[in-house]
Amino acid sequence: MDLDKPSVWGSLKQRTRPLLINLSKKKAKKSPSKPLDLRVQHHLDRRLSLSVPDLLEAEALAPEGRPYSGPQSSYISVPNSLSTAGIVPKSSSSSLKQSEEELDWSQEEASHVHGVDTDSEEIYASPAEEWQAFSQSALDLHKPSLGRDAPEEHDKTHGNDDLNASMTSQHFEEESTLGEASDCVSHLPSPFAYLLTIHLKEGRNLVVRDRCGTSDPYVKFKLNGKTLYKSKVIYKNLNPIWDEIVVLPIQSLDQKLRVKVYDRDLTKSDFMGSAFVVLRDLELNRTTEHILKLEDPNSLEDDMGVIVLNLNLVVKQGDFKRHRWSNRKRLSASKSSLIRNLRLSESLRKNQLWNGIISITLLEGKNVSGGNMTEMFVQLKLGEQRYKSKTLCKSANPQWQEQFDFHYFSDRMGILDIEVWGKDSKKHEERLGTCKVDISALPLKQDNCLELPLESCQGALLMLITLTPCTGVSISDLCVCPFEDPSERQQISQRYAFQNSLKDVKDVGILQVKVLKASDLLAADFSGKSDPFCLLELGNDRLQTHTIYKNLNPEWNKVFTFPIKDIHDVLEVTVFDEDGDKAPDFLGKVAIPLLSIRDGQPNCYVLKNKDLEQAFKGLIYLELDLIYNPVKASIRTFTPREKRFVEDSRKLSKKILSRDVDRVKRLTLAIWNTVQFFKSCFQWESTLRSTIAFVVFLVTVWNFELYMIPLALLLLFLYNFLRPMKGKASSTQDSQESTDVEEEGKEEEKESEKKGIIERIYMVQDIVSTVQNILEEVASFGERIKNVFNWTVPFLSLLACLILAITTVILYFIPLRYIILLWGINKFTKKLRNPYSIDNNELLDFLSRVPSDIQKVQYAELKLCGSHSPLRKKRSTV
């Protein structure tokens, strides 16, 4: 058959081509994501297509070719001149260049264009066939002889890109990466292909929207009326610091980026002002700081504060144009696979393994100027890790004496940001000074004592920074499990053997966690599925599995190892549902204390809710293995616990407040019952019980020695150890009581919803009133003790001095044992001597006569002034 003559089927296609194009245009309007696919039919010669190199001329063309990075890349370079453009395939072994004959051939055959239908059932093709078909379609798109068809298809593809440009920054990056990894052609950057990097830094002097004189601000970034990003909420702060970075895709520069600030409340968000940025005024490839003044035409405030942010506008590099092949089944399979791989790599990117620990000891401040602040504290930040020191009263040389541990990564050590903050009497926070430390410039395994001068403030901070390498953290598959290798396990066990107890005391042990699978998870998506992944937390150490998409019974089969710094830490395994650029949805959680781990045994754990108090939907299968040194663990027990990273402060919750009040009541009731038991012994309510108690008291006090105190505590431990079943039953009963309390709380909430808001207010008022009374009693007791020694009431102070003098003489001549015996005999025989006597505590009775500070003000006598004379007032009325 002569290949130069078109077939009958080809001639029929050639005649019906205008009708097919018009039909495809109508379909493209309905579904702009499906562009028209055109092919060119070429005469076959000794090569398969233009994109396949002529191996006979490869040696002659190689010196003139262009370099190529590797065979795995599918990027094809297209020159700017489309009329003479040749598509050059790249090879890892040689570089090729098109000859003039090939260019003439490509131009000559540009007129033979018609649509080609491929087999839709073929999902996979050979690499040569993929390269041939792709290069053929790429050539068609750049032939000048296509006339109107090529620009129309180009516009359709750009319309599709316009739709993609309105997505979030995370999806935008995934699509661009997908374009690079799939078969595509490079074009000049499109006018809408911009990326805007926003660094939301802080707010200053924002308006008050809460009754307490503060606000809970957060920021929204809007473009064309759509919210592209929402920041986190900073509670009770008029000078919030967000320090958040987001990358947004920009469709056109003829737009305004709206920045709106809101105050978060329980029912609605109050508006705190807005500002805008004209995108066309931004300079390309340059980071500029913008201080945006907030305004609200409906508000009476003149100054609503400012928002400080950095903006950087860049042209998106590598703006590729994707073309859908007619083989839709094959494209959808490859696209979904690529997206899944991209999401997987993104998830694994978050699981960076740290290489060591940065131990920072905040010693003190020197000559720190606090201004009108009454309290001071320090914030430390390294990447996403944050710590906050304890708050001290204002002092020129505050002594913090605190230690914080950061993770460091060898590839990005980063800068340690240190900020000194102050609080005034109204609890408004203000940044006093800052300083920075380049961690990469510090030597390893060495204590670095640094005195860091503060910027924008007088004074300095004295700190001790130590960098210690860490090798105990890893993520692997089940086939390369570290503890499965006997030699490696023996080596790890030897490292934590008893003879190495005094070597590297901070390295207590190592934990291996096998995250096997989960089952029957909660469906978080509208499709009835979830995209679950696991987050493992041990103290401040966090590792994460990859995401299993569209599955309620995922199998991760990953192995994680953690270095143990405290044997009393708790491993928290949380299952989340990945939700794109939004916060992940909660699917369940389980907490496992390290000391409760049974080595090497697979366990099935029932997932709990966020508060870890009730069962949630789903199960998770874990296998835990723990190796540690008991001596190191014991030494670590008597050192301060590791501080947790700074998290968002918890807001007032009626449920939590009520629960805590009930807990205090139960403890107080237990103490009160113990006191009542001793009082019943003194009151001789039961003759047998009081007699036994009196005899035990006499024998104990007469034979008492100091070593008997720890011995009595040991007997208490032994008593509880010999009755484990009863102890377990009591603990189970306590947990059931807590669950019952929660169920009662839920029922009360339902009832309160029926009763209305008045009952809720009364319930909260009752709780707050109880807390208020307890605090008042505690404060009054402490103030009365202080006022005894301050001679507030001279009679009581003189009486106390007389009693203390007599007590001193008695203790000097009479042993303490006899004094306690006399006191006990008096207590036990008081009811026998006087059956109608009222039991009392003499010390508390004495202190009740001393006024508190509030009573001192109430009892103080006001001086009579002439203007306040009652006679003068009567005369003025006359």
Curated annotation (Swiss-Prot):
Residue segments, region Disordered: 20-40, 143-178, 728-752
Basic and acidic residues bias locations: 149-161
Keywords: Calcium, Developmental protein, Membrane, Metal-binding, Repeat, Transmembrane, Transmembrane helix
Compositionally biased spans, kind Acidic residues: 737-746
Domain (C2): residue spans on this chain: 177-292, 334-452, 486-607
Subcellular location: Membrane
Annotated residues for binding of Ca(2+) 3: 525, 531, 577, 579
Major location (coarse): membrane
Transmembrane segments: 694-714, 794-814
Stored SUPFAM superfamilies: C2 domain (Calcium/lipid-binding domain, CaLB)
Cofactor binding: number and manner: Binds Ca(2+) via the C2 domains in absence of phospholipids.
Single annotated GO MF: calcium ion binding
Annotated Ca(2+) 4 binding sites: 525, 577, 579, 585
InterPro entries, A to Z: C2_dom, C2_domain_sf, MCTP_C
UniProt: Ca(2+) 2 binding residues: 210, 263, 265, 270
Positions with a binding annotation for Ca(2+) 1: 210, 216, 263, 265
Entry GO CC: cytosol; membrane; nucleoplasm
Cofactor: Ca(2+)
Family of this protein: Belongs to the MCTP family.
Role, per record: Might play a role in the development of cardiac outflow tract.
PANTHER family: C2 DOMAIN-CONTAINING PROTEIN, MULTIPLE C2 AND TRANSMEMBRANE DOMAIN-CONTAINING PROTEIN 2
Name used for this protein in its record: Multiple C2 and transmembrane domain-containing protein 2
Source organism (scientific name): Mus musculus (Mouse)
